[in-house]
Amino acid sequence: MRRGRLIVVSGPSGAGKSTLIRAALDAVPQLAYSVSATTRAPRPGEVNGRDYIFLSREEFERWIREGRFLEWAEYSGNLYGTPAHRVEEYLESGLSVILEIELQGARKVRRKRPDAVMIFVRAPSLEETRRRLEGRATESEDAVQRRLATAVEEVAARDEFDCEVVNDDYERAREEMIEIMRRIVAGGDPC
């Protein structure tokens, strides 16, 4: 059996990464999703173990000390990390694994695993990113401003990625993401 491939999906908050990933997971059975751990509070409707593994800062720091993360980083005041053991299990079973992580984490994965396929997802403009973040109604204006400042840095780094999906039209972006994932699991050039 052929080993799966590691896929990193990154981009600014509000780009639509999660929605596009869910569409790809539904369409491509050879994919698995790596559930990240985080110290941030759950959003309405999020389920522990499905959307994230929600940990206290103390628990998360213990996992760091124990070497349980493939990568971890701090983003907007919260810690996020990829549990290593689950990723390895998926890859060994022949599934390609999607990691949805921020730029710092994506860079760490690229250093550790240069064979990882890196996909950058973004909204068509900073104004659209702002509109989407404000539409969530889950964050303060200060938090939105911090995420927008981070988005500028993230978009500036998009050339570090193998593929870019501009989520300006959901159906088009969805089809593009699914096609990229199909090429990855087939062992081909993704972009």
Curated annotation (Swiss-Prot):
It is an enzyme of class 2 (transferase). GO terms for cellular component: cytosol. Pfam families: Guanylate_kin (PF00625). ATP binds at residues 11-18. One of its GO terms (molecular function) is ATP binding. Its main location: cytoplasm. Essential for recycling GMP and indirectly, cGMP. This is Guanylate kinase.
